[in-house]
Amino acid sequence: AEEKEKVLLNSGIQKIFILPYKDSVVHSSIETFLDFLTNRNVRKIVVGKDFTFGDKGIGKPMDLLRREDRGCEVVIKDLMDFEYKGTKQKISSSAIKQLLKDKGLEEANKLLGYPYIRTGKVIKGHQNGRKIGFPTANMLPPKTKICLPEGVYQTVTLVEGKWYPSRTNIGNHPTIDEEDKTIIETNIFGVDFDLYGLNITVSFIRYLRDQTKFDSMDDLKRNLEQLKEEILLGSNNDSKRKA
């Protein structure tokens, strides 16, 4: 919820009111729900054609039009299509979640209108990355939102108000000290200070490769160097295009 609020505020919305999730709202009748909106002086409602409200989704977009005679404008939007792997689908939260599960990160980001993000507190790890020259900021997977598939991602990371290019691994680092749980590890390029305890935001740009168990530490280091060079080159090219 906090991440959604940040996205909405960054889009220019000045104030957010989150509808309380309680029986009186979830199981309300159509009229009770409409009165709830009227009592809060709602002046404009924008919903998709598949929007439902009230007990068991009894309320439909056309029911909202009843409030137009009370000075509330109602806009009902058509659902847009997108094509993925030769199949047309309606843009929906379910479709986006499926794309994320299928490693279709770039397509999911297009539909979201912004990159998938993960905000969390940096926790202490085994410092294995630091030992081979690639220190990471570690976070636990989110409990209340979909976690991306295991693998390596191109990311950018927000640390104390500044964005840095970065590489993120989601998995159990099988080459060194394989874990029995999934960790989100981000190697942030250009940050050389202690991040433990800080809240950071990782923005996921592109899926790079599957999690791989390398034959040796040297093979792993060579691959990480190659990925770093590729990510930094891409970041520089993006900066030039924006200039």
Role assignments for model-derived ranges:
Residues 124-243:
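Phosphate/ribose-recognition catalytic cores of enzymes acting on nucleotide-derived substrates
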